[in-house]
Amino acid sequence: MSRINYSETGLKVGLEIHVQLDTARKLFCKCPTLLSEAEAREVFTRYLRPAKSEVGEIDRAALLEWKKNKKYEYEAPVESSCLVEADEEPPHEINEDALLVALALASSMNMRIINEIHVMRKMVIDGSNVSGFQRTALIAVNGYIMDNEEKIGIQTLCLEEDAARKIDESETTVRYRIDRLGIPLVEVATAPDIHDPEQAVRVALKIGQLIRLTGRAKRGLGTIRQDLNISIKGGAKVEIKGVQHLYLISKVIEYEVLRQLKLLEIRDELVKRGVSPENISDNIIDVTDVFRDTGSKIVKKALSIPGGGVYAVVLRGFKGLLGIEIQPGRRFGSELADYARIWGGVGGIFHTDELPNYGITREEVQALYMKTGADPGIDAIVIVADVKQKAVEALKAVVERARIAVIGVPEETRAANPDGTTKYMRPRPGSARMYPETDIPPIYITPELMEKASKLIPEPPEKKLEKYVREHGLSTELAKAVINDLRLDLYERLVEKYMGKIPASIIASTLVNIIPSLRRDGVPIENIDDYVIEDVLDAVANNEIAKEAIPDVLSSIARNPGKSIKDVIKELGLGVVSISELDELINEAIKKNMDKITAKREKAFQIVMSEVMKSVRGRIDGALVAEKVREKLKEILK
């Protein structure tokens, strides 16, 4: 997969797997766990600020969010939110169903369950929690799962409330919808025992399987999220948030290792050049006059804003380093730009390693060096075009990041991009953001609770695989696909419902082969929900359609949502063929092709079968057609 030798780099990876639980109500109120797309009649506004922790400290990540000075607006759909989400009413008692799932999951991972659970408040003031904190409860610690022959430590399992959904964002305002706020979420955190990208995928898959095997995991986009903690020898611990897809995990790890290795190379080069943090000046220079007559559209636009100008900092000894690629499509200059955007709120930066470009001419670059007194042979210049206050804050952040570059890799929280690269998000949060939830009494884990939870402990994936092959008659490959599928719980329910009517292999194939195939063909499979699948299988079980018609029926329903299955069957002409009709069609096919049949006896079956299937495909079981054709040909060709 990669040329990186991960054992030499000393790679350590820890996973945090977050999965929404499919419970009837939210974690601390009676509201249903349903997302609402209806127009919200209630909208309210909040401004959030950080509070000091129990030891009098303010978390630096919370401080960053506060400095953005954002207004937060909240849409409150009445069907899935109440005064608890609006932080106008104390939380109710914890959802016991969610607690039981968490206890069962902890047991399945050999964890030590805490006998007295205290709900905590974790400070979050990015607006995603109306109260400014997320309620979270530590359920269990110190467990493990097996990856091949190796133990992977499971450090903690927490039960917490999910955040609100971000709907829109502008420069001054963020808008959220609070229907998702409070949905129960389990967070499983592994120890940093993972040492290569493929192992990380296996471990994430296994934890995800265990959660799904409880039968209580929600499905759909956004219901599962992986965060990664990654470090290498000589580098730093970096948290990467929001890896949505399993297949991206290995790529994110590879690209983060590459980034840290490149940053260490840049550090070594800076040291070699004699650069130290102390000689990186934070002197910000107004260079607006250099660009008064610029042809750059971006700079012109900035200068047209009242108070707009162009400002610069000189990075002594950095020439050529800002253009070094540290991840595919991202350079060291991209890292500086991330800091400028987050801390200054600007759109981006220019730097001399990429100029002349973007309408900025060679003459303007030369004038820039003259104006700042920088050495064109060894120095780099970073410029920002914006109002002075924002530009100054952005360039201060650039200088701070440049100083860190001389030391090495910074500890930080980064966001995953869809291509597996990452961007700076905020400093790593400290321990100062957690304090007790005083509105919820301690929860005591009694033998009665553990007895209830024991009924939800998932069967290990290995045993489930063996069962599907032995009892359900699935191939090993198909059984593995089912266990890895998000509709695993649906599969088990449908197998039980259609026992003796539809083979388990047909149900499995519908879920893991047919539906993904339709997606690849451009069919809008988001319109195929559990009810649609069940309706189609009902039609198969009741002999209204043959199993061969399943793809066509699902495709038609997906393209015409709201249309009844009976109408679809009628429009597609998929009514089941009777045995007498089949016999008649076989006789007609034989009569029509008698000359070919007698001339090519060895191909007689293919000739007749092909002719008959033109008329009955999707309307009767192909195996039955084949059986009837063979019987008829046996009579004729004696």
Curated annotation (Swiss-Prot):
GO biological process terms held by the UniProt record: glutaminyl-tRNAGln biosynthesis via transamidation; translation
Matches recorded under InterPro entries: Asn/Gln-tRNA_amidoTrfase_suB/E (IPR017959), Asn/Gln-tRNA_Trfase_suB/E_cat (IPR006075), Asn/Gln_amidotransferase (IPR018027), Asn/Gln_tRNA_amidoTrase-B-like (IPR003789), GAD-like_sf (IPR004115), GAD_dom (IPR029351), GatB_C_1 (IPR042114), GatB_Yqey_C_2 (IPR023168)
GO cellular component: cytoplasm
SUPFAM superfamilies, A to Z: GAD domain-like (SSF55261), GatB/YqeY motif (SSF89095), Glutamine synthetase/guanido kinase (SSF55931)
The reaction(s) this protein catalyses: L-glutamyl-tRNA(Gln) + L-glutamine + ATP + H2O = L-glutaminyl-tRNA(Gln) + L-glutamate + ADP + phosphate + H(+)
Domain of life according to the entry: Archaea
Keywords from the named record: ATP-binding, Ligase, Nucleotide-binding, Protein biosynthesis
Gene3D superfamilies, per the entry: 1.10.10.410, GAD-like domain (3.30.1360.30), GatB domain, N-terminal subdomain (1.10.150.380)
Record PANTHER family: GLUTAMYL-TRNA GLN AMIDOTRANSFERASE SUBUNIT B MITOCHONDRIAL AND PROKARYOTIC PET112-RELATED (PTHR11659), GLUTAMYL-TRNA(GLN) AMIDOTRANSFERASE SUBUNIT E (PTHR11659:SF2)
HAMAP family: GatE (MF_00588)
Subunit and interaction comment: Heterodimer of GatD and GatE.
UniProt protein name: Glutamyl-tRNA(Gln) amidotransferase subunit E
Species assigned in the record: Desulfurococcus amylolyticus (strain DSM 18924 / JCM 16383 / VKM B-2413 / 1221n) (Desulfurococcus kamchatkensis)
Gene label: gatE
